[in-house]
Amino acid sequence: MSFPAPKPKAPELPQKLQHKLECNQGAVRAVRFNVDGNYCMTCGSDKSLKLWNPHKGSLLKTYSGHGYEVLDTAGSCDNSQLCSCSSDKTVILWDVAQGQVVRKFRGHAGKVNCVQFNEEATVIISGSIDSSIRCWDCRSRRPDAIQIMDEAKDGISSVKVSAHEILAGSVDGNLRRYDLRKGEMCADYLGSPITCVSFSQDSQCLLASSLDSTLRLLDKDTGELLGEYTGHQNLSYKLDSCLSEKDTHVLSCSEDGTVCFWDLVEGSLVLKLPVGKAVVQSLSFHPTECCLLTASEGGVQVWRGASYEEEGGS
């Protein structure tokens, strides 16, 4: 006789505070894991970009070159370079080890909200309050953008890249997806200014958060609305949202000092993680592990699953 298979264990959620990073760079506008999750970057209102080992709580390097606050950053696939963008209207390509500016790209007419590398880290994609997305060639000496997407009617708040596709959210309420191979653009109107967009890990779904305190999950190919997630507060600020490392949960920052977790399939709010008293502006989920970074009150908090023990004991 065979016994019924045991029910799969519910995935752990990162709700145990492991470290706090005192960033000392004014307000932390964004925190981002690098590609393998071993390091993270923080963007400061004091114009600095910092590289950390968040698991040890140690600062590795500070990058100075922007003329105004740094708003977003991303790491290259081989960890040798960083890109960042700023209210100074520029995008900078950095050498990680040297701490030096490799290239400074100018062309946006207003502050640059978001930045990403393509998968090979040969192109930087940036989105600006000037309503345009610009693509910059990291390898050429060409000062101007190699491609400009200007379909948006208002500022670009968020861009993400997956294979040959660019996903962009705009204050005009549209979620736009550019297929670079086919040269096609699809738009889904969500009705409220979009603050953050993400691809699911399998790239089949799109997540968008809006200033109506709602997150929406859409089927990438059909645009069908698969889920709506509410219970957090997002009416005024550009806040981050994302999916967990195995696509089991939807996460969002909240203006009430928490991070909210929803079950992706059921849509139920399963955890309100109390981070602090102030707005939680940014978050980043580890690419493969149950580990979350949050940015609030001038610092970064590193969260792990309840069963996590550090090497050499808990």
Curated annotation (Swiss-Prot):
The keyword Phosphoprotein does not apply. Coiled coil: none annotated. PROSITE patterns: WD_REPEATS_1, WD_REPEATS_2, WD_REPEATS_REGION. WD repeats lie at residues 23-62, 65-104, 107-146, 151-188, 189-228, 231-272, 275-313. It is found in: Cytoplasm. Belongs to the WD repeat MORG1 family. Molecular scaffold protein for various multimeric protein complexes. Acts as a module in the assembly of a multicomponent scaffold for the ERK pathway, linking ERK responses to specific agonists. Also involved in response to hypoxia by acting as a negative regulator of HIF1A/HIF-1-alpha. This is WD repeat domain-containing protein 83. It comes from Xenopus laevis (African clawed frog). The gene is wdr83.
